[in-house]
């Protein structure tokens, strides 16, 4: 018999990246932002707020895909490279 677990997760900015609402903003180019979406339903994944990653299940393997959506944060974007980093912490529930 397998135990049933769910997974909670927390998405956080790392290094010089910050957030504006549910958008990750690179420290080296604040004119762009990145929103993370669940691929299955295109819902926004919140930053700095725990969310349910996997519902309680007896499945031994679960795959969750995400999308990163780039958006302009200003009407006068700065062209060029940028670096943004986020980490995801996962918790058994």
Task: Locate each region found by the language model.
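Mature extracellular/passenger domains of Gram-negative fimbrial/pilin and adhesin proteins
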Residues: 1-93
């Amino acid at each position: 018999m397998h135990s049933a677990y769910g997974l909670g997760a927390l998405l956080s900015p790392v290094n010089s990246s910050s957030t504006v609402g549910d958008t990750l903003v690179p420290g080296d180019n604040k004119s762009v932002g990145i929103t993370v979406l669940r691929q299955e339903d295109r819902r926004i994944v919140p930053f700095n707020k725990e969310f349910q990653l996997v519902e309680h299940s007896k499945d031994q393997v679960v795959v969750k895909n995400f999308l990163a959506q780039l958006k302009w944060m200003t009407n006068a974007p700065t062209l060029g490279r940028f670096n943004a980093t986020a980490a995801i912490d996962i918790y058994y529930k």
